[in-house]
Amino acid sequence: MEKMDVYFVNSKSTGKESVNKDLDFTKAHHLMLTFGYKLSDNLLLKVEPYAQFLYDVPVIADSSYSVLNRREFYVEEALVNKGKGRNIGVDITLEQYLSRGFYYLVTASVFDSKYKGGDGVWHNTRFNRRFILNTLIGKEWMVGSKRQNILSANAKFTLQGGERYSPLDHAASLAHPDKEALYDETRAY
C-alpha cells in the first residue's frame, strides 16, 4: 500500500478528483538464501544473496516516473499499476564477537536496483548506489579500583555509492520560469 495521499490526489493537469482511488497495491516476490559459517568461537561469516521482483508498481503512463523513486510529498498525476522493479544483490557480514575486550563488524552489500516506468524502459532506481560498506570496531578496558567500570574506544566507517538523480532540463525550465524546475525524463537516474 502506498501512502494515503497517493490514492486521494487531484490531478494537476486534468483537474479530476481522486484519480488514483482505484489504484491497486504494489506486489513482490522475494527470494533469499542465508549461509552462515562459524570461523571460530568468536568469528562468524554470513553471506545472503537475494532477489526481489516487484510488479503492479504505480507509475505515470508514458513517463519514467515510478513510486519506487518517490520522495516528493505528493504526486499530482493519475497513476497506473503497470510498473515493475527488481533488486538483486548479496549482503556479506563478518562479525567478531566481543573477546578479550575487542570486537568488530564488517558488512558489505553489492546490489543492483532497477525499475520499469510507464515508458516501458528499465532505469536505475534513485537508490541504486551499487555498494555499501560499513565497518565498526571497538576495544573495551575494565578500569577502576574494582575493575567494574568500562572504558571503550570505538570507530565506525561507511562507504557507499552516490544517490542517483535525473538531470535538469535547462531549456524546458527556462521556457517556463513561473513553474518549478523540469527534469529530463529521458535520462532518468
Language model: regions and residue ranges:
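Short, intrinsically disordered, charge-balanced linker/junction segments flanking boundaries
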Residues: 182-189
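Hydrophobic faces of transmembrane alpha-helices in multi-pass small-molecule transporters and flippases
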Residues: 27, 31-35, 90
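Gram-negative outer-membrane beta-barrel transporters
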Residues: 51-53, 71-161
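Surface-exposed loop and edge beta-strand positions of immunoglobulin-like domains
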Residues: 24-26, 36, 48-50, 83, ...
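Short acidic, gly/pro-rich beta-turn/loop elements at beta-sheet edges
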Residues: 43-46, 57-59, 63-64, 102, ...
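Surface-exposed extracellular loop regions of Gram-negative outer-membrane beta-barrel proteins
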Residues: 1-30, 51-77, 156-177
